[in-house]
């Protein structure tokens, strides 16, 4: 059982029921999925770049990512319809909680000049987006074996109705928000 899942069941639910006066446990928001997306625009020129990005994302998420393809051709970017332009992986269940645990306790503290996550990543419906500029903050990535520093987008989809509920949920998971 994942450490953060036990933390959610035993502590977070009680805190949120007390804070927002929910009537049942089913009203308490929870994280449904975490989506990791890595855009690799240079993959149209060199196929090896996409293979490296896929292997990095696979090491980070412990799950095989799918390759996303361009929906339409854009001449200025030298991209044709169907060209690979990125990779993504969706985490649910125990793997999601294990990734969240590694993100909060190991990866985020390794970010250089980190002063907390800004609260502007909420979308108005209780979901949270954040970007990471370098994949080397994850301990699974060996610094000597990467070809290029790549960033990735992390989207946390929750059942929260408002951003306030979602921020309280993520703060209960010890997410380091700026005050």
From Swiss-Prot:
Keywords tagged on the record: Ribonucleoprotein, Ribosomal protein, RNA-binding, rRNA-binding, tRNA-binding
Any one GO BP annotation for this protein: translation
Signal sequence coordinates: none
One example GO MF annotation: structural constituent of ribosome
InterPro entries: Ribosomal_uL5 (IPR002132), Ribosomal_uL5_bac-type (IPR020930), Ribosomal_uL5_C (IPR031309), Ribosomal_uL5_dom_sf (IPR022803), Ribosomal_uL5_N (IPR031310)
Keyword tRNA-binding among record annotations: yes
CC terms in the record's Gene Ontology section: ribonucleoprotein complex; ribosome
Entry-linked HAMAP family: Ribosomal_uL5_B
Functional summary from the UniProt entry: This is one of the proteins that bind and probably mediate the attachment of the 5S RNA into the large ribosomal subunit, where it forms part of the central protuberance. In the 70S ribosome it contacts protein S13 of the 30S subunit (bridge B1b), connecting the 2 subunits; this bridge is implicated in subunit movement. Contacts the P site tRNA; the 5S rRNA and some of its associated proteins might help stabilize positioning of ribosome-bound tRNAs.
Similarity comment text for this entry: Belongs to the universal ribosomal protein uL5 family.
Subunit structure: Part of the 50S ribosomal subunit; part of the 5S rRNA/L5/L18/L25 subcomplex. Contacts the 5S rRNA and the P site tRNA. Forms a bridge to the 30S subunit in the 70S ribosome.
Protein name per UniProt: Large ribosomal subunit protein uL5
Organism of this sequence: Nitrosomonas eutropha (strain DSM 101675 / C91 / Nm57)
